[in-house]
Amino acid sequence: MHVMYIAGVMSGTSLDGIDVALVRIEGSGVESKVELIHFTTVPFCNDIKSEIQQALSIENSNVQLICSLNFKLGLCFANAVKEVCKEANFSLEQLDLIGSHGQTIYHQPKQDGNRIPSTLQIGEPAVIAYETNTTVISNFRTMDMAAGGQGAPLVPYSEVILYRDPSKNRLLQNIGGISNVTVIPNQQSDQNVIAFDTGPGNMIIDEVCQRLFQLPYDQNGEIAKQGRVVNEILTYCMSHQFLKMNPPKSTGREQFGEKFVSELLKRFEKHSKENILTTVTMFTANSIVHHYKKFILPYYEIDEVILGGGGSYNSTLVEMLRNGLKDENCAIFIQEDIGYSSEAKEAIAFAILANETHHCNPSNVPSATGAKQSVVLGNITFPPV
């Protein structure tokens, strides 16, 4: 079976840095054998992070900034690929492909007036291809959207390859900046794989931490442990329109970013900062549980919930999730419990998607994104001859 060595590159909505997974993949399709060789996260320097944050702001962004940042990030992504190869003592010349998600600048999954559904990820693939002398596959979301999908979530295809079990029905819950869930029926089942965003992950928690505590995030949920849940704030959060929508659906910074947090802090400024952080942590947990109870558990018998992403390291958030699901008779694990990496999960996913595109295989899941059909994802950029 043909073997490919691929670097999956992911820069998510949390802006933690650039995640890079060096992966060995044997074959293609659902029978692929995937092995993680090495994973690293390369932090953004403060200047780049500041420019990304400015580019994400409708009020402060401009086309000149986005144009320049597109090339700067391409260089950052190329350097991150070189770094993962260096750490793994792996020759860059051996690398067959790079799958680059890019940095999402704006994602509009549904029509809004005269604005049609669209998405924009930057991090120029030509720069990556030139700097690494390696073929790059990028812009994975656009073809799904061209086919009528929301362009998200895209990880379900990789999750079926990695996590489908002969007898257990599993929920894969990713808690990154945004939270998304994939329902993976067992190998004997004729039920569909479904997936959708459940709302905020770390996004609101991190933004509140930065504004109220001058910290990038709540490490291990230690601050949230000290406060109490304020029902008035929780009710306000849980009334968000996104929670009332039916899947397939996706969301992002546009709904749960700076604007949401500014309004929340203005409205509830009389409450202690610890209580506010505890409550928005509970909001993330409750929004996940809400979607399970409304859209999944009435239709699927779930044996295991497997948590991944940076939020799985927040023990307060995980405990809130356990309490919310204590009556549902399903075991809850984090990725590390079953031999995988919570941090590397999405970067591995884009290595797998790059492999599928290389083999001309469709790799969106229409039941997850709402696309009219399965499509081959991504644009291919070749290195200089």
From Swiss-Prot:
Q: What reaction does this catalyse?
A: 1,6-anhydro-N-acetyl-beta-muramate + ATP + H2O = N-acetyl-D-muramate 6-phosphate + ADP + H(+)
Where ATP binds, per the record, is at G12, T13, S14, L15, D16, G17, I18, D19
For the protein in the UniProt heading, the enzyme class is transferase
GO terms (BP aspect): 1,6-anhydro-N-acetyl-beta-muramic acid catabolic process; amino sugar metabolic process; peptidoglycan turnover
Output the superkingdom of the source species: Bacteria
Pathway as given in its UniProt record: Amino-sugar metabolism; 1,6-anhydro-N-acetylmuramate degradation; Cell wall biogenesis; peptidoglycan recycling
Q: Which Gene3D superfamilies match?
A: 3.30.420.40
Any idea which UniProt keywords this protein has?
A: ATP-binding, Carbohydrate metabolism, Kinase, Nucleotide-binding, Transferase
Protein EC: 2.7.1.170
Asked whether the UniProt record includes Signal among its keywords, one would answer: no
Q: Which GO molecular function, any one, fits this protein according to its record?
A: ATP binding
The UniProt function text for this chain reads: Catalyzes the specific phosphorylation of 1,6-anhydro-N-acetylmuramic acid (anhMurNAc) with the simultaneous cleavage of the 1,6-anhydro ring, generating MurNAc-6-P. Is required for the utilization of anhMurNAc either imported from the medium or derived from its own cell wall murein, and thus plays a role in cell wall recycling.
Give the protein family: Belongs to the anhydro-N-acetylmuramic acid kinase family.
Q: What's the protein called, per UniProt?
A: Anhydro-N-acetylmuramic acid kinase
What organism is recorded for this protein?
A: Bacillus thuringiensis (strain Al Hakam)
